[in-house]
Amino acid sequence: MNSIEFPLLDRTTPISVISTTSNDLSNWSRLSSLWPLLYGTSCCFIEFASLIGSRFDFDRYGLVPRSSPRQADLILTAGTVTMKMAPSLVRLYEQMPEQKYVIAMGACTITGGMFSTDSYSTVRGVDKLIPVDVYLPGCPPKPEAIIDAITKLRKKISREIYEDRIRSQQGNRCFTTNHKFHIGRTTNTGNYDQGLLYQPPSTSKIAPEAFFKYKKSVSSSELVN
């Protein structure tokens, strides 16, 4: 049994019989199977690396780091986010399957940190790009604080309602693109045909200046659609 109490559990008279809802069962099954995508750009990420050792042992929480966003349900941003990296971060978040969560780790990620005063290329908070579930302040946060943030995220998941989560994410989504493939007929000549795969311009190809101007000029509802 997980260390976190089973959410909204109704027990019947026999001890061996448990009744609950499919939503609560889904939440409970995801508590110990968080697969994080580690997005580290600065010194805060070194503190997270301390959790890999036997002293803190983050494996006991079921955390399995993934190198692909399509296999992750948690992205942990640690370090400074520049305007040039902002489109790439949003693209990684959009590639993650539902349900997905975000932990903002460190002062530079949350507010821009010491780079937010004089730097023209620093994003003043990652929540301007993607919705954040847990804020973890510090410069840098200790490994114990990271474990506490993961525990708070698991408690939030245990009380979550799926429909409310999807509705909230659709309202807070900052930027999105549709990726479409065009399939055509060709002969096997050994040469790669660039015309076979057609994809609209992605966020990684958008200049940082144009990216932020587009966000300011268009409402959030238009961005989603």
UniProtKB/Swiss-Prot annotation:
It catalyses: a plastoquinone + NADH + (n+1) H(+)(in) = a plastoquinol + NAD(+) + n H(+)(out); a plastoquinone + NADPH + (n+1) H(+)(in) = a plastoquinol + NADP(+) + n H(+)(out). GO terms for molecular function: 4 iron, 4 sulfur cluster binding; iron ion binding; NADH dehydrogenase (ubiquinone) activity; quinone binding. Signal peptide: none annotated. GO terms for cellular component: chloroplast thylakoid membrane; respiratory chain complex I. Its cofactor is [4Fe-4S] cluster. InterPro entries: NADH_UbQ_OxRdtase-like_20kDa (IPR006137), NADH_UQ_OxRdtase_20Kd_su (IPR006138). Its EC number is 7.1.1.-. It is an enzyme of class 7 (translocase). It is a peripheral membrane protein. [4Fe-4S] cluster binds at residues 43-44, 108, 139. Binds 1 [4Fe-4S] cluster. Transmembrane segments: none annotated. Keywords: 4Fe-4S, Chloroplast, Iron, Iron-sulfur, Membrane, Metal-binding, NAD, NADP, Plastid, Plastoquinone, Quinone, Thylakoid, Translocase, Transport. Belongs to the complex I 20 kDa subunit family. NDH shuttles electrons from NAD(P)H:plastoquinone, via FMN and iron-sulfur (Fe-S) centers, to quinones in the photosynthetic chain and possibly in a chloroplast respiratory chain. The immediate electron acceptor for the enzyme in this species is believed to be plastoquinone. Couples the redox reaction to proton translocation, and thus conserves the redox energy in a proton gradient. NDH is composed of at least 16 different subunits, 5 of which are encoded in the nucleus. PANTHER family: NADH DEHYDROGENASE, NADH DEHYDROGENASE [UBIQUINONE] IRON-SULFUR PROTEIN 7, MITOCHONDRIAL. This is NAD(P)H-quinone oxidoreductase subunit K, chloroplastic. The lineage of its organism: Eukaryota, Viridiplantae, Streptophyta, Embryophyta, Tracheophyta.
